[in-house]
A protein has these predicted regions:
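A conserved acidic beta->alpha catalytic loop
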Residues: 22, 35-48, 94
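Glycine-rich, basic loop-to-helix element that forms the pyrophosphate-binding segment
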Residues: 63-82
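Conserved donor NDP-sugar-binding/catalytic core segment of glycosyltransferases
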Residues: 99-134
Length: 303
């Protein structure tokens, strides 16, 4: 089985090198690795390009700089749909365990071919503090909830998707950051894909810093603004477009605005409301289709 790893990176050269090293030190090597670089600084891009050249079968792309979803689309569209069976999305601060790819192949090998085509497998990530992130379900309000049943969402940097899925669907580029993996999984479920929890797939998060570290508004951080804007967007899309239910949509909006107003008042940040709405881009859900077609990439360097 041919597995491609798509690495999205932004301003973290040291972590990128460690991420690539872990992938290529795997007991079973990836078929190919694609690095899509959203770094703004040309000098950092040059450093990252040189790092990539140290690893065989690794492609370097300059990123679109329109958010994590556009960056992931840029990476996955550089993989061959004819020459790739499964795709993993690995952030630059992730180090896979040496048996990650071997365990994924072993799990897929146990399935009939037709089941393989429609199965997404997801493992577990462990933070630098030892906290584990597990596959989950989405609550009515759009929060991730632990489950012992069939998951509805994946741990994105410890998951594998059939490559054919991205010939049908793409990451939603109207989500800048936050809940983008939940939205993608909702579309996969709607298209009859199944998500299978595979705890033997293990990865480690090696960074405690976010690329979104920046001043927020009042007592709400920049990261939280993006997360809550994305939760609003995904919640509306869930009940309006993906699984239409006017009553659930109305209930979701009522609860969201009531709870968010209380949260902002408690933080002394009620003035953040307009910025959350602006970042959510919910008006696009009433306009044209917002999922891009798969496009071939440019600016490719193969080491």
């Amino acid at each position: 089985m041919r597995i491609a790893a798509c690495i999205t990176t932004r301003n973290r050269s040291e972590q990128l090198d460690a991420c690539l090293k872990a992938l290529w030190n795997s007991t079973v090597k990836p078929h190919t690795v694609v690095v899509s670089d959203d770094s703004q600084d040309v000098e950092i891009q040059k450093i990252n390009s040189q790092i990539v050249k140290q690893y065989p079968e690794t492609i370097y792309l300059t990123g679109p700089r329109r958010g994590v979803c556009a960056n992931r689309n840029n990476a996955v569209n550089a993989t061959s749909a004819l020459d790739t069976d499964f795709v993993a999305f690995v952030d630059d601060d992730i180090c896979v365990e040496p048996d990650f790819i071997a365990n994924a192949i072993d799990r897929y090998s146990q399935m009939p071919n037709e089941q393989r085509k429609y199965t997404i497998i997801t493992g577990i990530s462990t933070s630098t503090q030892g906290e584990k992130l597990l596959p989950s379900k989405l609550s009515f309000q759009g929060y991730f909830c632990a489950t012992e049943e069939t998951p509805e969402t994946v741990v994105i940097h410890a998951a594998l998707f059939p490559r054919q899925f991205f010939s049908q669907e793409q990451w939603d580029e109207d989500i800048y950051f936050g809940y983008e993996d939940a939205e993608l999984c909702l579309r996969a479920i709607k298209s009859n894909y199944k998500i299978l929890s595979c705890p033997e797939l293990q990865v480690n998060v090696k960074s405690t810093e976010s690329v979104l570290d920046a001043p927020g508004i009042g007592g709400v951080s920049n990261y939280e603004l993006h997360i809550e804007a994305a939760r609003l967007y995904v919640g509306i899309k869930r009940y309006k477009n993906l699984f239409p239910n006017p009553l659930k949509l109305l209930a979701f909006l009522s609860i969201y605005f009531a709870h968010m107003s209380g949260f902002l008042l408690k933080r002394g940040s009620i003035q953040a409301w307009p910025e959350i709405i602006r970042r959510s881009r919910i008006q696009l859900l009433w306009q044209q289709e917002n999922i891009p077609e798969a496009q071939p990439s440019s600016s490719v360097i193969i080491s």
